Amino acid sequence: MALSANLFLRQSQSLVMTPQLMQSIQLLQMTHFELNQFIAQEVEKNPLLEFPSNDGEAGDERGAGEDEPFGQPSEDAGSDDGADSRAEALSSDWYDNGGSESTGRLNDELDANYTNVFPDDGGPQRLDAPELVGQWKSMPGSAEGADYDLDDFVAGQLSLRDHLAQQIPFVLPDMTDRLIAQNFVDQLDDAGYLQTDLVETGERLGTSLEQVEHVLAALQTLDPPGVFARSLAECLAIQLRQKDRYDPAMQALVANLELLARRDFATLKRLCGVDEEDLLDMLGEIRQLNPKPGGGFEAGVSEAIMPDVVVRPSADGGWLVELNPDTLPRVLVNQSYFSRVTRNGEDHAFLSECLQSANWLTRTLDQRAKTIMKVASEIVRQQDAFLLNGVDHLRPLNLKTVAEAIKMHESTVSRVTSNKYMLTPRGLFELKYFFTVSISAVEGGEQHSAEAVRATRFRALIMQESPDAVLSDDDIVDMLKKGGIDLARRTVAKYREAMNIASSVQRRREKRALAKVAGF
């Protein structure tokens, strides 16, 4: 049979994702910060979109004076009565009158226009920047568009770098040494450890290794003790040296921290050359040291998480679910501007496209809010016991259950719960927190939430251990089974490792050591 090429016609139907549909999907999974940035970009591109003004007036409610050129007097502006009333109003306001007179005097004295030297506009501001009260708290005008709230700095602590910069002049009088020290300060991580190589630093700064080591030795005497260490052992050694407790036995202990992590106390006693009582005293001193000397300082401006949904108890005993108005985007379509400008046929096509895009955006934002409300309301209905009684009553829940209840697709529910937060009487939770896998119950009972088992029952069993009765993974399985929870041993081991809980052998060594320390 010979092979040949032929042409065929076929009709078919398929779904095509339009740009508008892709945009609605993207908006659904955005956080409110990302959404505000996106809307600000759209307002900048689309002349029909605008933010509402603070007094509640926007768009077509600005009045007929919008068509008049700025600074053009109106018809009644030339009347004597209107001029007298305005003059009387100005003269009655001491602040405005005094300000205008002061401005005139400055213009004469500076031989320049005051507004050119000190403009009223402090620089470029975000389109959604707060006004009125917010202007007294914010610091706009950054070239990068940064917008900080002064409330973030009121209760803020001194940063680690600022704290060290205040001490450097007292230990390093030489300016060259101070420059090297500042380079070291810039290389610190949030825990206060130095993340750089001394040889590389010396070559980069064009100085000798001896001078670099001299500067580092001086910096390691600063407060907090242990700062500028390059390892945990060096951090502990610096703190012990400042306490005058860095003797040969303690040096051997610090040099073998891996044995301490394994609770191999027999080997540590032999290496340190001490008996059990002295070793316990040394371990007590180690526990009093700070492994993260820079942890008590602010790393930067704190960023508060704003909830997208707020849940409150209602008067009828249920729950009132509301969208947070502070996170809802506010954007309007200026229909009156479209009607006035489209009288010119040349602009009609462009503005019609802008109007279509603006209407689609507003409908998408409205649909996004309704979808978040539906998903949040169903989550609250499913997790009613958790809101009333706590994490021990958290029910197992998956995306499919919520999607079927609200008649939406699982992917839609997944996008809604991504990076969205709910404020409840129990605290602030991400929406994904309420979705946990189920754990089978013994003899076909009610299933349990994996998060509830980990957070309450599993941890409670570990905390109730005694030095002479440490539970192994098999023991935990048996005790959970008595409580109606069916878990495999490998699942218990996985939960234990995820919660950073040591094995039964290591826990037994640690509890016995702590008991001996408490006994002395």
Curated annotation (Swiss-Prot):
One of the record's GO cellular component terms: DNA-directed RNA polymerase complex
Motif (RPON box): 488-496
Annotated region of DNA binding: 398-417
InterPro entries attached to this UniProt entry: RNA_pol_sigma_54 (IPR000394), RNA_pol_sigma_54_core-bd (IPR007046), RNA_pol_sigma_54_DNA-bd (IPR007634), RpoN_core-bd_sf (IPR038709)
Region of interest (Disordered), residue spans: 49-107
Highest taxon of source: Bacteria
Keyword annotations: DNA-binding, DNA-directed RNA polymerase, Nitrogen fixation, Nucleotidyltransferase, Sigma factor, Transcription, Transcription regulation, Transferase
GO molecular function, one term: DNA binding
Biological process according to GO: DNA-templated transcription initiation; nitrogen fixation
Pfam families for the chain: Sigma54_AID, Sigma54_CBD, Sigma54_DBD
Task performed by this protein: Sigma factors are initiation factors that promote the attachment of RNA polymerase to specific initiation sites and are then released. This sigma factor is responsible for the expression of the nitrogen fixation genes (nif operon), GlnA and DctA for dicarboxylate transport. The open complex (sigma-54 and core RNA polymerase) serves as the receptor for receipt of the melting signal from the remotely bound activator proteins NifA, NtrC, or DctD for the expression of the regulated proteins.
Family per record: Belongs to the sigma-54 factor family.
Family matches, as PANTHER family: RNA POLYMERASE SIGMA-54 FACTOR
Protein's name in the database: RNA polymerase sigma-54 factor
